[in-house]
């Protein structure tokens, strides 16, 4: 009682018949003024504070009675007014090192090609750029380089756009195979290969970027997407070869083998592969890969056994694509070293979830998996694991005569330090406590319910949605197949997102994770008015 505070008014805690309560002493906002803490006065502005009026800076004097105009920020130079200061936002992005940045590298990753009419590798690859800035246009440039590795770079502009505030732009880009296939051909190369096939995406203001492979659901049977991470967010140790990534991957379930229990079709064998794809962003970048999967030889890379090492020097636009040649091959736990920023993707041309050791256990069907990996420095200790929207329920609501079943989600957690990690979840039984012994050690978790995961040491966390059969949707109905997501730790959640739901899909879902007290709005509507919110245990 007697304590003072500032809101839009000067308020004092007073004793009332109902107990202690805040009461208004003076309504500053009604006078067009603000409350000054400690002085408990209504003033025009907070003494010695700065703010923005559009792109003009305003400075409050020492008394709070007047404001003066400062400089006008030059948006043509990538400068915008933030907190009363003219700020070079791309330079600020280098300090903040988040997933919002000014330089990205995108790659048309290897996808499934299993015959006429089933060639996902040839379908529309796209990059989507969203502008999260509230007040400035983002000028975006996308480039490719048609020279070959080892030659001097000669970037070519392939697309430009001015993206309005809080908007996005879809860039439909041409195919650029990374598996050594000649232009116009798909899956005819050496699989493991060195190409100059990356796209560079730059902006004069920080943006968010995604890639879709392919984009639209038009005769699509194998697709996924990646959240791209900017160069500003990557691990950097110029001139010093340092561990940059511990790989989170997934077993490659479709491959021709000599084992009839795992060979999908002996008369017409289908070889699909897991991949680890490394993109150079700076000249003369040394890269070393300690692989946990056998690598098929191709280009400058010899056949490399599990536990072997691959080393190469990359330049801008160079793509070192490493691929497997075996059933259940899996790059998980591999370590990528680099002495300058490199972008790393992991995935599969197409694979199933759950994975299996015998075809009799398969839960159809497979799908393309891909994700740009997060660098080691972003590993965290506290995560929220969520379950995809129940597809059998949605298909039943759309009129199909099927029952609704509990839909599992598959998760993988991996240790990134030599000390390993001790994992605790809010699940019961054997999944409540997990022990990871050393760098690259991982554990798989299956769950039909949301849960919290905490670790005593930094880890990376991934989810893979279930194949259609595993989700209880019969083939022939629109049930969907696996997709992979790198789950960020709670400490890295953002306050706003601008995103795309691609066209021509039967169902679109958005999963929102937020603290219980958060106010969440989707396109102007409170989320609580659109969908039911579920509390996650823990």
Give, region by region, the residue ranges found by the protein language model.
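Cysteine-rich, disulfide-bonded extracellular modules and peptides in secreted proteins
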Residues: 1-95
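Conserved functional hotspot residues at active sites or interaction interfaces
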Residues: 4, 49-50, 87-137, 142-333, ...
């Amino acid at each position: 009682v007697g304590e003072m505070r500032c809101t839009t008014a000067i308020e004092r805690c007073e004793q009332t018949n109902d107990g202690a309560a805040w009461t208004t002493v003076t309504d500053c906002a009604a006078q067009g003024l603000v409350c000054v803490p400690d002085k408990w006065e209504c003033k025009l502005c907070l003494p010695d504070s700065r703010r923005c009026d559009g792109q003009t800076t305003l400075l409050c004097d020492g008394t709070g009675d007047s404001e003066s105009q400062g400089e006008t920020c030059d948006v043509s130079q990538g400068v915008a007014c933030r907190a009363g200061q003219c700020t070079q936002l791309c330079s600020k992005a280098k300090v903040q090192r988040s997933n919002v940045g000014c330089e990205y590298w995108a790659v048309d990753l290897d996808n499934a090609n299993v015959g006429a009419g089933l060639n996902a590798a040839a379908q529309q690859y796209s990059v989507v750029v969203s502008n999260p800035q509230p007040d400035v246009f983002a000028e975006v440039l996308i480039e490719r380089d048609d020279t070959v590795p080892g030659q001097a770079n000669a970037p070519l502009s392939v697309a430009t756009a001015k993206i309005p505030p809080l908007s996005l732009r879809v860039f439909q880009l041409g195919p650029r195979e990374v598996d050594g296939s000649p232009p116009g051909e798909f899956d005819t190369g050496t699989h493991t290969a060195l190409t100059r096939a990356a796209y560079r995406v730059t902006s004069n203001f920080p943006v968010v970027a995604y890639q879709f492979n392919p984009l639209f659901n038009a005769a699509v049977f194998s697709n996924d997407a990646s959240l791209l991470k900017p160069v500003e967010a990557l691990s950097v140790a110029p001139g010093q070869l340092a561990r940059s990534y511990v790989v989170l991957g997934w077993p490659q379930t479709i491959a021709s083998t000599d084992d009839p229990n795992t060979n999908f079709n002996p008369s017409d064998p289908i070889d699909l592969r897991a991949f680890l794809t490394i993109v150079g962003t700076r000249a003369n970048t040394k890269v070393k890969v300690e692989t946990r999967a056998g690598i098929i030889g191709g280009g400058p890379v010899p056949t490399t056994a599990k536990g072997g090492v691959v080393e190469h020097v990359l330049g801008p636009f160079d793509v070192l694509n490493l691929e497997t040649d075996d059933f259940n091959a899996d790059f998980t736990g591999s370590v990528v070293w680099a002495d300058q920023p490199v972008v790393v993707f992991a995935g599969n041309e197409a694979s199933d979830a759950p994975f299996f050791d015998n075809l009799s256990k398969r839960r159809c069907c497979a799908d393309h998996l891909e994700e740009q990996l997060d660098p080691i420095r972003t590993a965290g200790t506290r995560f929220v694991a969520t379950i995809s929207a129940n597809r059998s329920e949605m298909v039943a609501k759309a009129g199909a005569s099927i029952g609704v079943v509990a839909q599992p989600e598959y998760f993988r957690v991996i240790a990134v330090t030599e000390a390993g990690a001790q994992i605790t979840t809010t699940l019961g039984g054997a999944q409540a406590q997990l022990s990871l012994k050393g760098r690259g050690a991982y554990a798989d978790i299956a769950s039909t319910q949301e849960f919290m995961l905490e670790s005593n040491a930094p880890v990376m966390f991934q989810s893979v949605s279930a194949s259609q059969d595993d989700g209880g949707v019969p083939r022939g109905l629109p049930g969907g197949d696996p997709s992979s997501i790198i789950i960020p730790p709670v400490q890295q959640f953002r306050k706003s997102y601008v995103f795309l739901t691609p066209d021509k899909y039967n169902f679109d879902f958005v999963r929102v994770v937020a603290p219980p007290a958060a106010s969440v709005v989707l396109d102007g509507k409170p989320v609580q008015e659109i969908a039911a919110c579920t509390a996650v245990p823990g």
